[in-house]
Amino acid sequence: MTKILIVEDEQNLARFIELELEHENYDVDIEYDGKPGLEKALSNTYDLILLDLMLPNINGLEICRQIRQNQTTPIIIITAKSDTYDKVAGLDYGADDYIVKPFDIEELLARIRAMLRRQPQKNLIDIKGIIIDKDAFKVTVDGQPLDLTKTEYDLLFLLVENRNHVLQREQIITDVWGYDTEVETNVVDVYIRYLRNKLKPFGKDKCIETVRGVGYVVRQ
């Protein structure tokens, strides 16, 4: 499901947009303050962000700038500022579109659809803030890169791709190390420990559950 973040301090407007987007089958998060809005944008994977300019604590331009340093997520600015200077500033800071309040909700929905059509499909798996980019062979946790060896990456990918399914140690060895390997099953336990140690600073080590006597599972 397409995920959209709304960062807007006018709660009634934010809630109205949320209801309209949910009616269109979008998955929606809302933040009413700039600081948590920025944190949520950087620690999650969104398909599009709707961003007000005049926000508490961190203004929309600064949020836009910081997002652009880390992501290419499409940003549509929604604001009462209608001057050409403000529009140019918003676009120069990295926004992809700019719509002035008050606006017709149908126009906003059309702009969202148009923006999403222009975006390439992301080949990502996202579970509990652990994001695996299958094209780039990279993993981020809450927006921060996770440094993994090839074997660690292959093991984490296997667990996440088979989320909610308990994988036996023998199956893990076959899928990660290959059919003709002489690796013992206890090596799986060693690499699970490596992964948990790397996930622990993010509070994600418990995402990999042990099923005693069987193997391991990552649950959605």
From Swiss-Prot:
Phosphorylated by ArlS. Keywords: Cytoplasm, DNA-binding, Phosphoprotein, Transcription, Transcription regulation, Two-component regulatory system. The keyword DNA-binding applies. The modification 4-aspartylphosphate is found at D52. The keyword Membrane does not apply. One of its GO terms (biological process) is regulation of DNA-templated transcription. GO terms for molecular function: phosphorelay response regulator activity; transcription cis-regulatory region binding. It is found in: Cytoplasm. GO terms for cellular component: cytosol; protein-DNA complex. Disulfide bonds: none annotated. InterPro entries: CheY-like_superfamily, OmpR/PhoB-type_DNA-bd, Sig_transdc_resp-reg_C-effctor, Sig_transdc_resp-reg_receiver, WalR-like, WH-like_DNA-bd_sf. Residues 3-116 form the Response regulatory domain. Its main location: cytoplasm. Pfam families: Response_reg, Trans_reg_C. Residues 122-220 bind DNA. Member of the two-component regulatory system ArlS/ArlR. PANTHER family: REGULATOR OF RPOS. This is Response regulator ArlR. The lineage of its organism: Bacteria, Bacillati, Bacillota, Bacilli, Bacillales.
